[in-house]
Amino acid sequence: MSKRFYWKKLRPIIISVVTCCAFFFILMAITSNRNGDLTIYVDRTSVTKSLSLSESSTLSNPKGKIYGPSLSEAWDTRMCEEEEDPSTVSCVPTDTYLLDGNNSGKHYISYTFYVFNSGIENLDYSMSLNIENTSKNLDDAIRINLYVNNALTTYAKKSNVTGEAELGTTAFESRDVIVSNTVTDVEPNEAIKYTIVVWVDGYDNECTNDKIGGSITLSMKFSVLGIV
């Protein structure tokens, strides 16, 4: 029997799960904030070395913190296969990274933004995508597509059965860190494009009834390096 779960937003803070027959009613909220379910922020800058964030490729309306979309309700889902139409099939489109800003659907979060050097000197920065909090191992069934300048990596927690990365994914870096890296020698006004796509993968063996009542909170942080 194929499994199918229904997700519904209950509060704008956590993923909260209850059950009704074979359904999950869940809030898909990725960070605790009042503006949306996804928060991206810069936590370290200086007068001459500074990062800013923008939803637009024109780098308009720069900010130190931006809020992504809220997901009100969704089924657990999967990535679309070739030639599948997400308007008629419950799946995550493969081309949302081509558009700026919020391109989320009913079943997934998709958000594109730009990190750019808003200072007057070249700089290096670190990026980390983190699990702030999770309960009932809901992170076992989460999938995250991270596009950096349109280059895709799919992240998932290691299989609890094999201890290896799930097929077609890169394993989370640690219990609390999905991925972290450093970008070097970014010139003034140079921008790096990021797209984050998040969904609960219904075809993951870990997407089971014991996740009912679970929650997860994520954050994404950018820090300028070399600031004294």
Question: At which residue positions do the language-model features occur?
Answer:
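C-terminal, structured domain-capping segment
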Residues: 93-123, 130-131, 176-228
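Surface-exposed interaction patch
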Residues: 4-6, 12, 21-53, 96-163
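Short, polar/proline-rich extracytoplasmic segments that appear immediately after membrane translocation
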Residues: 1-90, 102, 216, 225-228
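Glutamate identity and glutamate-enriched acidic tracts
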Residues: 43, 55, 73, 81-84, ...
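Feature targets compositionally biased, intrinsically disordered low-complexity regions
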Residues: 63, 67, 118, 162, ...
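Generic detector of ordered, mature protein regions
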Residues: 43, 51-53, 64-66, 71-73, ...
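Extracellular adhesion/glycan-binding regions together with long Ser/Thr-
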Residues: 3-9, 13-17, 85-98, 152-191
